[in-house]
Structure formats: C-alpha cells, structure tokens
A protein has these predicted regions:
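Conserved P-loop
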Residues: 112-194
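Residue-level signature of catalytic and energy-coupling elements of molecular machines
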Residues: 92, 131, 225
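Feature 3881 marks metal-assisted phosphotransfer/nuclease machinery
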Residues: 2-84, 90, 122
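Walker A (P-loop) ATP-phosphate-binding motif of ABC ATPase nucleotide-binding domains
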Residues: 99
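Walker A (P-loop) phosphate-binding loop of P-loop NTPases
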Residues: 107
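Conserved catalytic network of the ASCE P-loop NTPase/AAA+ motor domain
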Residues: 94, 123-126, 213-217
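Hydrophobic anchor at the beta1->P-loop junction of P-loop NTPases
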Residues: 102-104
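Conserved RecA-like ASCE ATPase "motif II neighborhood" in helicase/translocase motors
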Residues: 200-224
C-alpha cells in the first residue's frame, strides 16, 4: 500500500469491528487492482496487514490479519518469523480458503507451517479427520530400485522432510535450535512426547501421488509437498 494510505483514503474510509477483527471499506482507483484473498500491507507509524475480502470495481473491503508472530497466537507452538510466514499462516488457518499454494526457497518454513496448521485443525479444532501427505516420487540420482513393503513403507525414503518437521513440532522449545517447539511437546516429559508422536502418526497418512487418480477426500487436510 502507499505510505500515506490512511491519509489518502481517510475521506471515504469506513471501519468496523467483528469477532476481534477490524474491517475497512475503501474507495478509489486502487481498488480496481485488488483481488480477493490478496494481502496488502504498509509499514511505518500506522502498520497494517490485511486481506482483501471483497473487491468490486472502485470499492474494496479489507480484513486485518491475525498476528501469528505473537506467542499467544502460536500454531502448534510455531510462530511466524516474518511477514510472509504470517501471511501463510493466515491462509492455512482460514476456514474460508480451501486451496493454498506456497512458493519459496528451501528452508523458508513451507512444510513446517503447513504441518503445524494441519495438526492444529485436526487434533485441536477437529475441523479435519486426518492428514494426508503425498509427493511425487521422482528420485535424485540413481533409482534405488523396487522397495518392499506397503505403500506407506515404500514412500518412506521420500518423507525425510516430514520426519524432520515432526521432530521440530514434537520437541520442547528449549531443546529446539529454532527456539520453537510443538504444542504438546512440553507436557509429560519424554513419555508425553512419545504419546503425542503416536497420536500424531495415527492421524497422518502417507500416500503416493501415482495412485491418487479417482480418489475423493472428505474431511481431510491434503498436503502435496
């Protein structure tokens, strides 16, 4: 947004509160370029991070975001470390948005944030019944050949990122290099962490993308990594 956003739109600006969120209705030529579910922000003395809820010609409605960088809003013990991660968590935790794509370099937290959001909405809010994780099984380098076992066991070599992120989400914050830990990691010591990991694994199914054709998923949180 332009630095003088509030001054520029002050004449026709409407605002109201609903469910701890602040909403703004703005009018002007800028609105024509805004798209629904697009994020807008401005820094400075009056910082603003918002999501475009309605875009109709020269009118738009903005909804302020939940600040997931604050510990009180942590998602399964994970907090946003920058503006982009806060945007991602607002998308992943929004019940009105059914399809989210995240693009970023390796190590920017895409899988971690997605998995934390999935666990919260499956084990805490009960919005979903289980989590399904899949990815394309394309090897880097030489193929390791045919693998024995079930479909899930065959997928194990491609699920290293999942295991790494589950370790972070089930580790107390004081033991984590990032200073962040899982929601239930601090309850019950080692026994509690083991029980939590068992509970998590019971709700996570690993599937191969090669066998997805024709499937219909009801009440599932689907992650394509």
């Amino acid at each position: 947004l332009p630095p003088n956003f509030f001054f520029f739109f002050s004449k026709g600006l409407e605002s109201w509160k609903k469910d701890s969120r602040t909403y703004y209705r703005i009018k002007g030529p800028l609105c024509a370029d805004l798209m629904v579910n697009e994020f807008v922000w401005q820094d400075g003395p009056q910082p603003l991070q918002a999501l475009v809820k309605v875009s109709a010609g020269k009118t738009a409605e903005l909804e302020t975001l939940i600040d997931y960088s604050h510990q009180k809003n942590a998602v399964w013990g994970i907090t946003a470390r920058n503006r982009e991660q806060n945007f991602a968590l607002n998308l992943l935790m929004n019940p009105d948005i059914d399809f989210v794509t995240l693009l970023g370099q390796a190590g920017t937290g895409k899988t971690l944030l997605t998995l934390a959001s999935a666990l919260t909405q499956t084990l805490e809010t009960k919005r979903f019944a289980e989590i399904i994780i899949t990815r394309v099984t394309v090897p880097v380098g030489e193929d390791i050949g045919f693998l024995p076992g079930t479909e899930e066991e065959k997928m194990t070599p491609w699920m290293g990122a999942l295991e790494d992120n589950l370790d972070v989400l089930n580790k107390p914050a004081e033991q984590s290099a990032s200073g962040q830990g899982g929601q239930a990691a601090s309850y019950g010591g080692d026994w509690g962490r083991a029980a939590t990991m068992d509970l998590i694994r019971n709700r996570i199914k690993v599937k191969s993308l090669n066998f997805m054709r024709g499937r219909t998923f009801m009440n599932k949180f689907l992650i394509i990594d």
